[in-house]
Regions:
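Dinucleotide-binding Rossmann-like beta1-alpha1 core, especially the glycine-rich loop
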Residues: 50-127, 256-261, 265-271, 279, ...
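C-terminal catalytic lobe of FAD-dependent flavoproteins
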Residues: 256, 281-285, 292-428
């Protein structure tokens, strides 16, 4: 048996302690955990965390991380007392809008397999007698939610891991990360000694950015203070909680006022997000000697600012009348970690091989994410997908100090807000735009934001098309929720794309150039496609993990013998290719490949529609006939005097090309195409139409329809694996999966009434029981019906009847053909 690698974990809070235990369970005990504070109470967020665990999350992965945390803490016991008190979690609504949101959250829970139910005000009052029943419109109850004893759990995990052979060092500062040849070699301590290591994992919480700086890594995390108070004793709670946990009422969340509550014996604890954001400069934190560290004195517990809490105190007394004669006995401003998108930061650092992070992880998800990191280290991938929490998911502009501060503070303000899935952040905005932004604004573009990019959703200039839009292209009226960030203009834009020609801004699609003598070998090894084709070939393929999970889907265009252009999904893909290229060059210096992000230096216009060739004939002398430039081929062409790389691809299912040019010529390219297409009725179209058209065509969206937890065959993407290809990452798993019946499949659904809309993540019922969930949905303007894609049992077949639960209402739907539009690909290949 190979000896386990030497692992150093920085931080002995709830994440670091759980990770040490998860590694030990897997036989990795050559581990050292370093904590700058005393081991009995480290002084970070874990030490003052109130411990409320509400498992339900719009993210499937985050809900599953929370579920494992509950499971593990329940099993972590001493003297017959576990580290989790399963009192249940109750979220209440005091406004009609919140009541609807609770129904949506019940849908999330059902989709992800978490037992929950919606309850009336009387049931809320019965479960939590302190409530003012008249103020409550309804509630959402998850019986398995509850209270984590985080500090106690850390102590038991330390005892358990120590017994297994793990070493813990308290009161020990880390001053540097040692490295050689691009790999981590150890951790330097405050006394200048070095602990040698093959792997270092930073679980330093809000101190994480300081650890990241030691290797030149930007950790996009902002420490913010959050208020928590404890009342004096309530006669109503006297003698109610004699047990070791000191709580029996369900944990309570009053999101309409940004508040949450729990019992502390005969007192009530109150947490508030209703105050101003309070960024914390860690350099100003007081140094607390180990001998003085206590529950009331620690670095992460700051002085209470009563004036910030007073509005929340009034809101609390309105909801809990028993507190109207009570007072605040204790309060503090506690430091927690916030990120630009509210997610955790997990995974390998591309800057240094062997360095990992697991930060911005709250108690709720701690054991689940620790297990995922342990699986990542030991097995190479985690059981639960980490794609939403990958530390490398942010674009460079999203890791600047200014962006991290502004976006993280905005997330604090909006933490309990009712957020529509299409709702863009309010700030920061206008960070990245296509070079033809001015033209888009002239056409009245309505922009949504993604990864810092401003992307047109529809164009107000196309409203005039509604006057001549055929009746059969008009969509039924929507409910108020699905109508948000939607415009009927999208119907006209879809109509023009299918019947004439439209221009789509594809500039935000991330583009890489991979070049060098090892480029082909790199791409052949990492992708499922056969890339060894003649220059001009374009290949759609997948990137898999070793288990066959889909880590991304990409298009690879061979522009020259040793030069390729890739369309990828995110910064995660850039870092994956970059790291693998470095490893390849280290093993064989002659097989080097340079990986560059060319997105910002280029632009892309999708020119699609049955009249696209007529437009090209007016602006280029190059041959765009089917014989000259076939489907999934590329060519270097000149359009209006501008050098352009044209790729015969279409994500909307129509004839056309993705046209790539230098950013400096982008506006000129737009103007040339728009002028040439005028006589053919050309329009600019947005993402609203785009999403509808791509779903009609059955095109999957990575990160939404498919993730690393899915494999190609169940996702309907088996065609992207080159026949007889071997030796690529995931090939062994593919051989097994190809001949193994799948338990689930991605199915196309049509809505039976032809009018009701869903948006995604809703539960799907089969024979009256939850059986899956919606991934994407839209109104299909061409196919004249609302449609959705959903993960369902593989036994479902075309014609089967299901129901989609949308805000508590069951909507009948039918399993339909996939795709619904142009299944023979005649329009694309024409």
């Amino acid at each position: 048996m190979n000896q386990a690698p030497r692992v150093v974990i920085i931080g002995a809070g709830i994440v670091g302690a759980n990770l040490a235990d998860e590694l030990a369970v897997r036989g990795w005990v050559n581990t050292t955990v370093i904590e700058q504070g005393p081991l009995h109470l480290a002084g970070g967020s874990t030490s003052h965390a109130p411990g409320l665990v509400f498992q339900t999350n719009p993210s499937k992965s985050m809900t599953e991380f929370a579920g494992y945390t509950v499971e593990k803490l329940l099993s972590l016991t001493k003297d017959g007392v576990s580290c989790f008190n399963q009192v249940g979690g109750l979220e209440i609504a005091t406004t009609p809008e919140r009541l609807g949101e609770l129904a949506r959250r019940h849908g999330f829970a059902t989709s992800w397999g978490l037992e929950s139910r919606l309850i009336d005000p009387a049931e809320c009052k019965r479960l939590h007698p302190l409530l003012e029943e008249e103020a409550v419109l309804g509630g959402f109850l998850v019986p398995s939610d509850g209270l984590a004893s985080a500090a106690r759990a850390v102590q038991l995990l330390i005892e358990k891991s120590t017994a297994a052979g793990v070493r813990f060092l308290g009161d020990t500062a880390v001053t540097g990360i040692e490295q050689a040849d691009g790999k981590v070699t150890g951790v330097r301590l405050g006394d200048d000694t070095v602990i040698e290591a093959d792997i270092v994992v930073s679980c330093a919480g809000f101190w994480g950015p300081a650890i990241g700086e030691m290797i030149g890594m930007r950790v996009p995390l902002l420490p913010l203070a959050h208020q928590y108070v404890t009342t004096d004793a309530l006669p109503e709670l006297a003698g109610r909680n004699p047990g070791p946990h000191g709580a029996s009422l369900p944990i309570l969340r009053h999101q309409d006022k940004d508040l949450y509550y729990r019992e502390h014996g005969d007192r009530i604890g109150i947490g508030s997000y209703a105050h101003r954001p309070m960024p914390v400069d860690l350099d100003t934190l007081a140094k607390v000697p180990a001998e003085k560290m206590s529950e009331h004195e620690m670095p992460s517990r700051l002085d209470f600012t009563l004036e910030d809490f007073l509005p929340s105190w009034e809101d609390t007394k309105a909801l809990l009348p028993a507190l109207r004669e009570r007072s605040i006995e204790d309060g503090f401003n506690g430091i927690f970690s916030f990120t630009p998108d509210g997610g955790p930061l997990v995974g390998a650092a591309p800057e240094l091989e062997g360095f990992y992070v697991a930060e911005a992880v709250w108690v709720t998800h701690s054991a689940g994410i620790a297990r995922a990191v342990a699986e990542l280290l030991v097995d190479g991938q985690s059981t639960i997908s980490l794609h939403e929490g990958e530390v490398t998911r942010f674009e460079p502009i999203q890791t600047t100090k200014e962006y991290i501060s502004e976006a993280s503070q905005q997330n604090f303000v909006e933490i309990y807000d009712i957020r529509h899935p299409l709702e863009p952040r309010s700030s920061p905005r206008d960070l990245r735009s296509a070079p033809f932004r001015a033209r888009q604004e002239e056409l009245g573009a309505f922009f949504l934001e993604s990864a810092g990019w401003e992307r047109p959703h529809f164009f107000e200039a196309n409203r005039q098309l509604l006057e001549t839009l055929p009746d059969e292209w008009r969509a039924p009226a929507r409910d108020s929720w699905s109508n948000r960030f939607h415009s009927e203009i999208s119907a006209a834009e879809a109509w023009k794309t299918r019947t004439a020609v439209a221009m789509y801004d594809m500039t935000p699609l991330k583009r890489l150039e991979v070049a060098g003598p090892g480029a082909l070998a790199l791409l052949q090894r990492l992708s499922t496609g056969n890339i060894a084709k003649k220059p001009g070939a374009v290949t759609y393929c997948l990137l898999l993990n070793a288990d066959g999970g889909i880590r991304s889907d990409v298009t690879i265009a061979r522009l020259g013998e040793d030069r390729f252009q890739l369309g990828v999904n995110s910064n995660i893909d850039l870092d994956y290719f970059s790291v693998e290229a470095r490893r390849q060059a280290a093993a064989d210096p002659g097989a080097w490949a340079h990986v560059a992000d060319i997105t910002g230096a280029t632009c892309c216009i999708g020119l699609w529609g049955p009249l696209a060739r007529e437009v090209m004939a007016k602006v280029s002398e190059d041959d765009f006939s089917n014989e000259s430039l076939k489907y999934f081929r590329s060519a270097e062409v000149v359009i209006g005097g501008i050098p352009v790389t044209a790729m015969r691809l279409s994500y909307v299912g129509e004839l056309g090309w993705e046209l790539y040019a230098g950013a400096e010529t982008g506006q000129r390219l737009w103007d040339v195409l728009f002028a040439a297409g005028a006589e053919h009725g050309i329009i600019a179209a947005g993402r609203g139409a785009f999403n509808s058209l791509r779903l009609e065509k059955g095109y999957r969206l990575w990160g939404t329809d498919v993730t690393p937890e899915h494999h190609p065959f169940e996702a309907g993407l088996g065609f992207s694996i080159a026949k007889d290809k071997t030796g690529f990452v995931g090939a062994d798993a593919v051989d097994v999966l190809r001949n193994q019946p799948s338990e689930r499949a991605l199915r196309c659904l049509t809505i039976n009434d032809g009018t009701s809309m869903v948006l995604g993540k809703e539960p799907v019922y089969l024979d009256g029981s939850p059986a899956g969930y919606v991934t994407s949905a839209a109104y299909g303007y061409t196919v004249r019906t609302p449609l959705a894609y959903a993960w369902l049992p593989a036994s479902t077949v075309e014609g089967d009847q299901v129901e989609i639960e949308y805000f508590g209402r069951r909507i009948p739907a039918t399993v339909a053909a996939d795709p619904l539009f142009d299944p023979k690909m005649e329009r694309l290949r024409g």
